[in-house]
Amino acid sequence: KPKEKRKMDPSKYSTRYIALKLAYLGKNYGGFEFQAHGNEPTIEEELWNALTKACLIFPEDEKIVDWECCEYSKCGRTDVGVSAFGQVIGIRVRSNRPLPKTRVKLDENGAETLAAGEQMDIEAAEEGEKEQEEVTNEKPFDDVKDEIPYPRLLNRLLPADIRVLAWCPNPPPEFSARFSCRER
């Protein structure tokens, strides 16, 4: 009996928009851009498979290549058999950055007011205050050192003729791999 793959709950993870710089030898591929009825695999198809296997993106159906779930952009595309050594994509992926913790706000009676208007007891609110203190004493998240090593993770899952060369943790606001590209 095959093992059933458990799905990750995307709500438990933060995400971030990053840029990835790729290099690939196109000899074995039907170009960069995914084609639903193509005879050969494409670079985007291999990227999709690696990103979903690593649980870096959370599509509704992993078997259907649909980039809508992750703010995907690409700087260009290549034809069948063409190689590239500086292709850039922009994509929203899972991050190691901790989700913001809920801070406890007390009313004048010392009880936390919940969204539905219910109240917790004072003891629970005091526990919340302790939790709030812990939140402020945590060390700040380092965008590179504390983050998922995206190139290493993806390169382990991608075929040998497709490599992630680098990643940018903080692309400029409004970055689009397509429209921010200066040359092709």
Model-found features: residue ranges?
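Structured-RNA-binding interfaces characteristic of tRNA pseudouridine synthases
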Residues: 1-184
